[in-house]
């Protein structure tokens, strides 16, 4: 454990930041899972709505430094591909 006051403060801040980041990361994963579950259920409108809700959450995670922008782009691309595949499947 730290002995210097500033080190103690940084330890407290690090713990608070860790908890906050964990909550944000959990929210991110939840929204991504909602899209995947909606696609797997075969409900196109539900999947599209879930995707529309997930995109701003993914983008805000990048702005907060939670994930890298390339990971965000990859996640959005893969989710969108799933939704589009469902739309094509529903159309045919």
UniProtKB/Swiss-Prot annotation:
InterPro entries: Ribosomal_bS20 (IPR002583), Ribosomal_bS20_sf (IPR036510). It comes from the Bacteria. One of its GO terms (molecular function) is small ribosomal subunit rRNA binding. GO terms for biological process: translation. Residues 1-20 are annotated as: Disordered. SUPFAM superfamilies: Ribosomal protein S20 (SSF46992). GO terms for cellular component: cytosol; small ribosomal subunit. It holds the Pfam family Ribosomal_S20p. Keywords: Ribonucleoprotein, Ribosomal protein, RNA-binding, rRNA-binding. Binds directly to 16S ribosomal RNA. NCBIfam families: S20. Belongs to the bacterial ribosomal protein bS20 family. HAMAP family: Ribosomal_bS20. This is Small ribosomal subunit protein bS20. It comes from Methylococcus capsulatus (strain ATCC 33009 / NCIMB 11132 / Bath). The lineage of its organism: Bacteria, Pseudomonadati, Pseudomonadota, Gammaproteobacteria, Methylococcales. The gene is rpsT.
């Amino acid at each position: 454990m730290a002995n210097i006051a500033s080190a103690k403060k940084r330890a407290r801040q690090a713990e608070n930041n860790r908890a906050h980041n964990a909550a944000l990361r959990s929210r991110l994963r939840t929204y991504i899972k909602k899209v995947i579950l909606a696609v797997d259920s075969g409900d196109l409108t539900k999947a599209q709505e879930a995707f529309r809700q997930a995109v701003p959450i993914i983008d805000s995670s990048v702005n907060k430094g939670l994930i890298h922008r390339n990971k965000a782009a990859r996640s959005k691309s893969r989710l969108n591909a799933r939704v589009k595949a469902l739309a094509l499947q529903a159309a045919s």
